Curated annotation (Swiss-Prot):
This is Chitooligosaccharide deacetylase. GO terms for biological process: chitin catabolic process; diacetylchitobiose catabolic process; polysaccharide catabolic process. Its EC number is 3.5.1.105. InterPro entries: COD_ChbG_bac (IPR022948), Glyco_hydro/deAcase_b/a-brl (IPR011330), YdjC-like (IPR006879). Pathway: Glycan degradation; chitin degradation. One of its GO terms (molecular function) is metal ion binding. It comes from Escherichia coli (strain SMS-3-5 / SECEC). Involved in the degradation of chitin. ChbG is essential for growth on the acetylated chitooligosaccharides chitobiose and chitotriose but is dispensable for growth on cellobiose and chitosan dimer, the deacetylated form of chitobiose. Deacetylation of chitobiose-6-P and chitotriose-6-P is necessary for both the activation of the chb promoter by the regulatory protein ChbR and the hydrolysis of phosphorylated beta-glucosides by the phospho-beta-glucosidase ChbF.
Length: 249
């Protein structure tokens, strides 16, 4: 039985090093899809690079934890910027859901402005769309717009009937122990669960000053090495997986 594998590189637009890494992993590796931060400091650079890589499917990486929002968000920003205090607000059930709804729509329109088309799918920076308060907003929006959504079914809530997503999602290809065997273990675990479609999240990058400031720095370069390995591509095919994107879901 053929299975669909989507290898999605998060953080397109975060920095030039991140952008170049994603393009390299697509051009010479197994990355088939990426998600773009429309408020990222290198988003214009990402748009420019993407024009030469038409095979790369591009979705939207909804941002509520970094940089400046596109709309006024007094209930979520501090000194005009977004940050990781969103977790505290979520725990206190104090998220400004109307502001978040408006910001989602604005980032979506900005994506279309930048790339000239709808995103293939939605996910989010730091998985904030999986917060119980936020997920229904994003799921409803994706269903209404006819685009797919990353959904971790181990956490997921009720899905709209017409919402497209994969049967499986894994964030396990992450951390200090990145290797080809780890990636293949993710596939084998999915196969054992009987999933016919799987998204694997990744963050391949070259190191630049922005990436150096990230808590997750040098493993991004290791990811790039693994994802561009010829032996990995062969092993994926051997396991009955076909590389694709959310357009295939």
């Amino acid at each position: 039985m053929e299975r669909l594998l989507i290898v999605n590189a998060d953080d397109f637009g975060l920095s030039k090093g991140q952008n170049y890494g994603i393009i390299e992993a697509c051009r010479n590796g197994i990355v088939t899809s990426t998600t773009a931060l429309v408020n990222g400091q290198a988003i214009d650079h990402a748009v420019q690079l993407s024009r030469d890589e038409p095979s790369l499917a591009i979705g939207m990486h909804f941002v509520l934890t970094m940089g400046k929002p596109l709309t006024a968000m007094p209930g979520l920003t501090r000194d005009g910027v977004l940050g990781k205090w969103i977790w505290q607000l979520a725990e206190e059930d104090a998220l400004p859901l109307e502001e978040i709804t408006q910001e989602l729509a604005s980032q979506y329109l900005r994506f279309i402005e930048l790339f000239g088309r709808k995103p293939t799918h939605l996910d989010s920076h730091h998985h904030v769309h999986m917060f119980p308060q936020i997920f229904p907003i994003v799921a409803r929006f994706a269903a209404e717009e006819g685009i797919a959504l990353r959904a971790d079914r181990q956490m997921v809530f009720d899905l709209p009937v017409n919402l497209r997503t994969t049967q499986g999602f894994s964030s396990a290809f992450y951390g200090e122990e990145i290797s080809e065997s780890l990636f293949l273990q993710v596939l084998d675990d999915s196969s054992h669960r009987g999933e016919r479609s799987l998204e694997v999240m990744c963050h391949p990058a070259f190191i630049d000053n922005t990436i150096r400031q990230s808590a997750y720095c040098f493993p991004r370069l290791t990811e790039l090495d693994v994802l561009t390995s010829a032996s990995l591509k062969y092993a994926i095919a051997e396991r009955g997986y076909r590389l694709g994107s959310y357009l295939d879901v």
